[in-house]
Amino acid sequence: MRRGLLCGCLFLMPALCLMSGCGEKAEQEEKNSIRLGVSIYRWEDAFVSTLRAELEEKAKEYEQETGLKVVLDIVDAKESQSVQNGQVERFISLGCDALCINIVDRSAASDIIVRAMDADVPVVFFNREPVEEDMDRWDRLYYVGADAKESAVIQGTILADAYDA
């Protein structure tokens, strides 16, 4: 359930941005495709690997529902922030309409944000939330994922309940 909701949000956010014109270039009147750049911090992560497969499935569903072709460029950052920064540069140079980033280092999002702002490309960070100061820098940055504090409280409650039992 959580993966499906996360995938749906990840896919829907850039699509809505594009349809509302926030990712549109001035010279483009009508788009017949959406190009999304997706950088995943590490392929081997079981959850993220499942998420990748579901993103591809959601892209196919979206194409069938809207007739709009979805080009997904999904890459592995290999747990390297510098590799991920290079991937973002490449996505922007390819003309991606939106970026979906599973950030390697949540405290190093500023470089990605600056590049996206300069190119006017919205960014959806997922599963790992950048620091609040970075997220507040621009109104076209989004985060999809769990609230870490809330998750910790729930986990603590489960442990306490198990201990009391």
Regions inferred by a protein language model and the residue ranges of each:
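Sec-dependent N-terminal signal peptides
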Residues: 10-14
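Bacterial N-terminal signal peptides that target proteins for export
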Residues: 1-9
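A residue-level marker of the well-folded mature domains of exported/periplasmic proteins
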Residues: 22-165
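C-terminal motif of bacterial Sec signal peptides marking the signal peptidase cleavage site
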Residues: 17-21
